[in-house]
Amino acid sequence: MDHGNDSALPSTIYTVTVNDALALDRPQGMAGEGLAHAGGLALLAMAGALQFSIAIAQILLALALLCWAAMLVIRRERFTAPAFFLPLAAYAGATLVSAAFSSDPRTSFVDCKQLVLFLIVPAVYRLVQGQTRTLITVVLTCAAVSAAVGVIQFGILHYDQLSQRPQGTLGHYMTYSGLLMTVIAIAVARLLFDSSDRTWAALVLPALAVAVALTSTRSAWVGVCAAVALLFALKDFRLFAILPIVAAVFFALAPGMITKRFVSMFDNKDPTRIDRVAMVHEGERMIAARPLTGVGPNMVEQRYADYRGDDAVNKINPHLHNNPLQIAAERGLPALAIWLWFVVALCRDLLRRFASGAQRFLAAAALAAVVALLTAGLFEYNFGDSEVLMLFLTVVTLPAAADTSRFQVVSRRSDHQAPLAADL
């Protein structure tokens, strides 16, 4: 045996892999991995449950957040999140400031509980990782079942009037259509950009499209059209040639009330259109009166009569049916600026990931979800709809969660940690 040349030994002794780092502290590593696995499963179940029950979905989210927080403590990991979480956190801070200056702080602070949903971003970022495609499949499958329920409600149970529309098992047709809108964006993105798993998306897409059409929710229709247009533009402009065919099929097969509802979007005498114009004026008055902090979270409905003009159709409205207008009136112009910062930061991140070529399907799906939310949000305050917001935050975080290049082995003198992300 030759003992004269040991110079090659360090290259094997000091090569540390991810599994080696976890094995150096086996009890903490096993506990942390168990929590990460449980939290990831809870998030997958949450994404599916959103299609059926907000209560079940939020219970699952609470379990996921508990697992995530416990894992950070046990494994002594630092908090990590995608870069776009910073403006989202700042928006939460601006909301709390607005609540403090509200005419009814108690009501406003109670409404601020929705800010907890923002933690979906770091939780999905850390816990989902290699399960991103599975999560998408779960969402598509559950949405297909929910869509079937909506079609049955319309065709058999006679949910075929504006006063009673298909809503699946959810509490409101606007939430139902908003979720379907986002899932349609995901399904079309998978068809156009995924290298595999296209079959299931192709099978469920017709049911999703029919269900969202039957809700008679015009804002969701606009969101779907905008999302699909973006995906066509990203893939191949020649795809726009099929749009006239789709339009012809729609008008040929859609029930009369659906086509009438579609045409009403262009009717200047439509009462809902007139009332939305009036809401813009109410919002402008609220902003002019309290530009810095707004009237306070969840206070638009209570203060609506104070700012209502003669052109208003409804005496009271729960919100202003427009994301930027609602945020500015409710939380102030600084909060709106921060929210726009979040949107820009998110879009830049997703465009960068799409251009890089890695996980193009997830990036395209997330971009389509953003466009759908923003365009539909010109006619509906969907950023304040908990179910829609939960699915939206989950989908837009998936490209970052799937980015394995963010992991690195971190070794310390006292302990060895699992790979950590370094975006924040």
Can you annotate each of these PLM segments?
Residues 40, 63-69, 238-240, 245, ...:
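Transmembrane alpha-helices of multi-pass inner-membrane enzymes
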Residues 1-106, 123-133, 137, 191-194, ...:
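Transmembrane signal-anchor hairpin modules in multi-pass inner-membrane enzymes, especially those
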Residues 55-71, 111-123, 175-184, 221-229, ...:
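Membrane-embedded alpha-helical segments of multi-pass membrane proteins
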Residues 42, 47, 96-97, 131-162, ...:
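Alpha-helical transmembrane segments of multi-pass inner-membrane proteins
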Residues 267-278, 293-331:
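Long extracytoplasmic/lumenal interhelical loops at the membrane interface
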